[in-house]
Curated annotation (Swiss-Prot):
GO biological process: biosynthetic process
Keywords: Activator, Aminotransferase, DNA-binding, Pyridoxal phosphate, Repressor, Transcription, Transcription regulation, Transferase
DNA-binding among keywords: yes
Residue ranges annotated for the HTH gntR-type domain, each copy included: 14-82
Gene it is expressed from: gabR
Protein role: Activates the transcription of the gabTD operon. Is also a repressor of its own expression, both in the presence and absence of GABA. Binds specifically to the DNA region overlapping the -35 region of the gabT promoter and the -10 and +1 regions of the gabR promoter. Principally regulates the utilization of gamma-aminobutyrate.
Entry's Gene Ontology molecular function annotations: DNA binding; DNA-binding transcription factor activity; pyridoxal phosphate binding; transaminase activity
DNA-binding region: 42-61
Protein name, as recorded: HTH-type transcriptional regulatory protein GabR
Length: 479
């Protein structure tokens, strides 16, 4: 049988055996090589192509392994009988335009994003040292499947940490580690009653809202008052599960006082199977005031599901979060029996070493002071540039705050101009859970300062001024 194979012998080309393999596969699929026909012997094809027998043998062995050829002892290799494809071969696959990702190079942009941490000040060398120690100490653990809830010693380290820093009352057995809060929330929806009605803060965390909706859950929204979730609205709407961010309401920045926390706990205790999901968002960083302990620390009825993450205190890319389940839900979890751990064992063990070595608390202390100074410089620059035409809210905690501006421009106008000025920033409407809710009052923007470089503060504020007013301020009233 004559087979014509043209080989590319340039340095950039695929290996010779791969080219032979690809050509023969194509000939078989196109029926140019018919089923049960004999292909040339390895030596014959090698001589024809002026290549080594090993190259031809590697190609034949791959085709044999994939089922394109079969071998008969002392007779050689033959083409396997394959069904014809039911469709014609198309040109190289092209993704529809609406599914393509558009990459925008923002390396030269100034970022007021609320979704980041300050990577420039992350102690990467300390983290790598801890990783090396963890790998050396527990390398056998890396060869095993991790416990579904996470490695016990890691859960114990996190339990001690949140008991000390947040007042959370729990045992390691109650904790589940996962690769992000959304992963844990998805799991939680499967543990809570199927018919449970959820309620979230409005405005709030839209991704979590969409996760619940996509899971087929009924989700109500609760407007905020000056203390957080409105008790009157909760009483009126009668949900079964509240999702709240009491330490630093996302995105408004409100810190829920103890009086409202007690009201929420009493509400949960009024009826069986009511729960509060406490997303302890941004709890590590408070300024000018001491941290208020977690809502879970006040819980006397085991109705609070506590959720925490290391995305803000360390790095979002580590993807390590955790939740603490009340005994009733922990029992439901253990009865499932089919869950797998989603977080890397090495990341878990490195975190354990980072916490137990004291590096974590050292890092938090350093970053708290760093973020406080950066925040103060940013607010001072905003107030100076906008001459009293800006209101700052929710700046006592977390890595972002809310700003409202006296301007005729709408939020969308401001965001459009900001993008043109290479300024990354987001508006409050992004966090409206109800899509038909329209902007009322002054436009409000979320100002994140974690990623913002200190040397870019003044320039960033000046760009923001141009986005809000243009080159010349446009007053709200008057001509």
């Amino acid at each position: 049988m004559d087979i014509t194979i043209t080989l590319d012998r340039s340095e950039q080309a695929d290996y010779i055996y791969q080219q032979i393999y690809q050509k023969l596969k194509k000939e078989i699929l196109s029926r140019n090589l018919l089923p049960h026909s004999k292909v040339p012997s390895k030596r014959e094809l090698a001589e024809n192509l002026k290549v080594s027998v090993n190259s031809v043998n590697s190609a034949y062995q791959q085709l044999l392994a994939e089922g394109y050829l079969y071998a008969i002892e002392r007779k050689g290799f033959f083409v396997e009988e394959l069904d014809m494809f039911s469709a014609e071969e198309h040109p190289p696959f092209a993704l529809p335009d609406d599914l393509k990702e558009i990459h925008i190079d923002q390396s030269d942009w100034i970022s007021f994003s609320h979704m980041s941490s300050d990577t420039d000040h992350f102690p990467i060398k300390s983290w790598f040292r801890c990783e090396q120690k963890a790998a050396s100490r527990s390398y056998r653990t890396l060869g095993d499947m991790s416990h579904p809830q996470g490695i016990y010693e890691v859960r114990a380290a996190i339990t001690r940490l949140i008991s000390l820093t947040r007042g959370v009352k729990c045992r390691p057995e109650q904790m589940i580690i996962g690769a992000g809060t959304q992963v844990l929330m998805q799991l939680l929806t499967e543990l809570l009653p199927k018919e449970a009605v959820y309620a979230m803060e409005e405005p709030g965390y839209r991704r979590m809202y969409q996760l619940l909706k996509n899971a087929g859950k009924q989700v109500k929204t609760i407007m905020l008052d000056e203390k957080g979730m409105s008790i009157a609205e909760i009483t009126r709407q009668q949900p079964d599960v509240l999702v709240t961010t009491p330490s630093h309401q996302f995105p408004s920045g409100t810190i829920m006082p103890v009086s409202r926390r007690i009201q929420l706990l009493n509400w949960a205790a009024e009826e069986p199977r009511r729960y509060i999901i406490e997303d302890d968002y941004d709890s590590e960083f408070t300024y000018d005031v001491d941290s208020i302990p977690a809502l879970q620390s006040l819980d006397r009825f085991q109705n609070v599901i506590y959720m925490g993450t290391f995305s803000k205190s360390l790095l979002p890319g580590l993807r390590i979060s955790y939740m603490v389940l009340p005994p009733e839900l922990l029992r439901a979890y253990k009865q499932r029996g089919y869950d797998l751990q989603t977080c890397s064992s090495l990341t878990q063990l490195t975190l354990q070493e980072f916490i137990e070595s004291g590096e974590y608390q050292k890092h938090i202390k350093k970053m708290k002071q760093h973020y406080k100074e950066k925040r103060e410089r940013l607010i001072t620059a905003l107030e100076a540039e906008f001459s009293g035409e800006v209101t700052v809210k929710g700046a006592n905690a977390g890595l972002h705050f809310v700003t409202e501006f006296d301007t005729r421009r709408t939020e969308q106008d401001i965001l459009s101009h900001a993008a043109g000025l290479q300024l990354e920033i987001f508006g409050m409407s992004r966090f409206n859970l109800k899509e038909n809710k329209r902007q009322t009052g002054r436009p409000a923007l979320i100002i994140g300062f974690a990623r913002l470089k200190e040397e870019d503060i003044q320039e960033g504020v000046q760009r923001l001024f141009k986005a809000v007013y243009g080159h010349k301020k446009i007053p709200v009233t008057g001509d």
